Curated annotation (Swiss-Prot):
Its EC number is 6.1.1.20. It comes from Listeria monocytogenes serovar 1/2a (strain ATCC BAA-679 / EGD-e). Residues 409-484 form the B5 domain. Binds 2 magnesium ions per tetramer. This is Phenylalanine--tRNA ligase beta subunit. GO terms for biological process: phenylalanyl-tRNA aminoacylation.
């Protein structure tokens, strides 16, 4: 969130900190400030000018010769190429000697033979990003209101004598997604209470219920919904103070109605939405769940297909807005709007978050609803917004609101004690200091003997347990003020064997090129049973927050598939992920579920990316098979991993294998079924999942390091003709069993199938490597070992030596 330093100061009478000091102080209390930008650092000598005359440049069709009055005694001539410059305008002028962002210094110059003594500026040339410049001025200079005095400092007028704090708001601090919330935080830091925003004093006329009625079909998804009416309005540009506040917050001004809703959202953290009342097409608003495949064209001009479960605002027939996300083009406020229905509501955070993610539509409103908000500030925000629209548009504020209120206000009281606070924090804070801290935070404190009962304001919905209270005390008291104390007893550090093994697995997989993923343990009912290692029953939550998170997972792979799909939708086409996490299986009765640790992985796209030396290599079954085999070897497991062809729902029937270790099936590896890949917009994708406990319990052998051989090795090539259903693993096993102690390596270097070999036959070629670490091998030794291998292959596999 971008926070204006000057706007923060408006909440306090005497502000003691510079912008840099404020950023450091906020960071110390737990909200990270990613940067502080002084807007006027590269601006100098910029004033308001009046264009006295404007005529076409005699030698340049696209240039204008303007006579401009600034703060100097005489007007100056400025050559300007903006298409919208005209006589009579109040404009921003960078005088000769002025400095602008990017290191640009304005000099007296000649343009096509005409002298230019300065520059008429656009907002972008003053440092505003193009995405926040009003569309009317996107291609030209910015025209100031006519009442602005000529010659005044334009830097001050535009609010550029300011600093912007870039705040990284964590999900638990949604209260700081508003200027009021920031002011509360800052007030606690500087020991001052912030002033409350005051709304314009506008008289009301009429009754809102004469204009519209409201019906809410699902109160759980919409606990509060209200409409405030403003009529006889005139749509025009917002005043300069409002435009500059929005632009500095990263929001583009539109008009005096839309800008007020954005301003109130910034001020209170409460999204509002404005409907053109005459376009609604009904005198009744119905808030309901969307119908499957219902469509709406949103304000950005995109036609969006809704899903059942998305909350929509309708006129009783068709949607006019996606609740908490974005309004519909159907009821958009335009220059012809005369009556506005202003919406203020509280929507379920899980519902809005789900809709925002599924529609790939993230807005300032959805961000605030998704993170959660104070359900009791909406009336104040709606009243302020309605009054401000009436004041800025010359409209009539209609009396009252039409509302449906199903909120339940519960007082949030948490108990702790001074003794516990000091014992846990390691401090010696006095009761007086505690009282001061909670007063600064705006919390109500009641002292009963040693007990402290704290009533938490509704704006801090993130505070629910005693630990949260202790954190607040530590934050405001100052983390740097808490004394450093050594542990009372010594502890012996060290990792257990299983911890070491897990670290080895993570390091190996990351070294192999996979990235660690962390996904939810909660999933949907459908995903809970997909691709599981076991057929055990799933565990359902008794009170799930949403259908998407109603069950505990029995497999990690479905979540990795969703993660891969999410990445590919954002043009990250080559994905390699792994996750080590817990899956859950139901037990009989009310017993706790069985928890099992699994390791899962997924690869899709290219394994090797193309460059000037090589072509891209797509992922395949053997890439992932090699990674899994390497993992088993890295753990020092003595037994060999066996691969058994199998079939599993949602995996490719011809490219799926179960993993068998020490006679026990411990997992699977395979390609996703093409139908699953198509459903998630994936290319060829391979996955595996292994029971971690089986890996940890497998017999290990100690790693013994051998010196580098002093004697040369000898090799023999064998080409075998075998049945088509004879696999490499079976051949390799026979060779190992009969190759003797001199055989140190087996390498498959060729596979051939063709009509010339005969029906259902294939040829495999191997290189066998022999080595004796104590002497030089002789031909007789190698031939003897090779003969034993050949005899065994002929006897056990009916192989023909070619």
């Amino acid at each position: 969130m971008l926070v204006s330093y000057n706007w923060v100061k408006e909440f306090f009478q005497d502000f003691p900190l510079t912008a840099e000091e404020l950023g450091e102080a906020i960071t110390r209390t737990g909200i990270e400030i990613e940067g502080v930008e002084e807007l006027s650092a590269s601006l100098k000598n910029v004033v308001v000018g009046e264009v006295l005359s404007c005529e076409r440049h005699p030698d340049a069709e696209k240039l204008n010769k303007c006579l401009v009055q600034t703060d100097e005694a005489e007007p100056v001539q400025i050559i300007c190429g903006a298409p919208n410059v005209a006589a009579g305008q109040k404009v921003i002028v960078a005088k000769v000697g002025a400095r602008l962002p990017g290191g640009l210094k304005i000099k007296r110059a000649k343009l096509r033979g005409e002298v230019s003594e300065g520059m008429i500026c656009s907002l972008a040339e003053l440092g505003f990003e193009s995405k926040v410049v009003p569309k009317a001025y996107a291609e030209g200079i910015y025209v100031l209101p006519a009442h602005v005095e000529t010659g005044v400092n334009a830097i001050t007028l535009l609010g550029l004598d300011d600093a912007i704090l870039d705040m990284a708001i964590t999900p638990n601090r949604a209260d700081a997604l508003s200027m009021k919330g920031v002011a509360h935080e800052v007030g606690a830091i500087i020991h001052q209470k912030p002033a409350q925003p005051t709304e314009p004093d506008v008289s009301e006329k009429g009754k809102a219920e004469d204009f519209i009625s409201v019906e809410v079909e699902n109160p759980a998804e919409t606990p509060y919904y209200a409409i405030k009416m403003v009529e006889n309005i005139e749509i025009k540009e917002s005043p300069l103070w409002l435009q500059t506040k929005l632009m500095k917050a990263g929001i583009r001004p539109h008009n005096n109605v839309v800008d007020v809703t954005n301003y109130i959202n910034l001020l209170y953290g409460q999204p509002l939405h404005s409907f053109d009342y005459d376009k609604i097409g009904s005198k009744k608003i119905v808030v309901r769940s969307a119908k499957e495949q219902e469509e709406i064209t949103t304000l950005d001009g995109e036609k969006r297909t809704l899903q059942a479960g998305h909350t929509v605002i309708t006129n009783g027939v068709e949607p006019i807005a996606i609740a908490g996300v974005m309004g519909g083009e159907f009821s958009e406020v335009t220059e012809n709007t005369t009556t506005v229905a202003l919406e203020g509501a509280i929507f379920s955070s899980s519902s809005i978050g789900k809709a925002s993610r599924e529609l790939y539509l993230r807005t300032e409103a959805s961000i605030r609803y998704d993170k959660g908000s104070d359900a009791w500030k909406v009336e104040k925000a709606l009243a302020h917004g309605g009054a401000l629209i009436a004041e800025l548009s010359g409209g009539t504020l209609v009396g009252g609101v039409v509302e449906v209120d199903n909120r339940e206000k519960a007082v949030n009281k948490i108990e702790t004690s001074l003794t516990r606070i000091n014992r846990i924090l390691g401090t010696a804070i006095t009761l007086t200091e505690i009282e001061t801290i909670f007063d600064r935070l705006g919390f109500v404190l009641e002292v009963k003997n040693d007990a402290l009962i704290i009533e938490v304001p509704t704006r801090r919905w993130d505070i629910t347990i005693e630990a949260d209270i202790l954190e607040e005390v530590a934050r405001i008291y100052g983390y740097d003020e808490i004394p450093v104390t050594l542990p009372a007893t010594s502890t012996t550090g060290g990792l257990s064997d299983s911890q070491k093994a897990r670290r080895v697995m993570r390091a190996y997989l990351e070294g192999a090129g996979l990235n660690q993923a962390l996904t939810y343990s909660l999933t949907s009912k459908k995903d809970a049973t997909r691709l599981a290692l076991s057929d055990e029953k799933t565990v359902a939550l008794s009170m799930p927050m949403s259908e998407e998170h109603s069950h505990l997972r029995t497999s990690i792979v479905p979540q990795l598939i969703r993660s891969a799909s999410y990445n590919i939708a954002r043009k990250n086409m080559d994905v390699a992920l792994y996750e080590m996490g817990t899956v859950f299986y139901a037990t009989e009765g009310d017993n706790l579920p069985i928890e099992q640790e699994h390791l899962a992985g997924l690869i899709t796209g290219n394994w090797h990316i193309a460059d000037w030396q090589k072509t891209p290599k797509p992922v395949d079954f053997f890439v992932l098979k090699g990674i899994v085999e390497g993992l088993v070897n890295k753990l020092g497991i003595k037994s060999e991993l066996h691969w058994k062809q199998t079939e599993k729902e949602e995996l490719h029937p011809g490219r799926t294998a179960s993993l068998v270790l020490e006679g026990q099936e411990i997992g699977y590896l395979g390609a996703l079924h093409p139908a699953v890949e198509a459903n998630y917009d994936l290319k060829e994708t391979y996955v595996f999942e292994i029971n971690v406990a089986a890996l940890l319990d497998a017999t290990k052998e100690k790693v013994v390091y051998h010196p580098i051989p002093r004697y040369p090795e000898m090799t023999r090539d064998l080409a075998l003709l075998v049945d088509k259903d004879t696999n490499h693993a079976a051949i390799s096993q026979v060779i190992k069993e009969h190759g003797g102690k001199l055989l140190v390596d087996i390498e498959l270097f060729d596979i051939f199938e063709g009509e010339s070999l005969g029906e259902n036959k294939k040829s495999l070629a191997y290189t066998l490597t022999f080595l004796d670490s104590e002497r030089t091998l002789v031909e007789e030794d190698v031939q003897k070992a090779t003969n034993k291998v050949v005899e065994a292959l002929q006897e056990k596999l009916n192989a023909i030596i070619r």
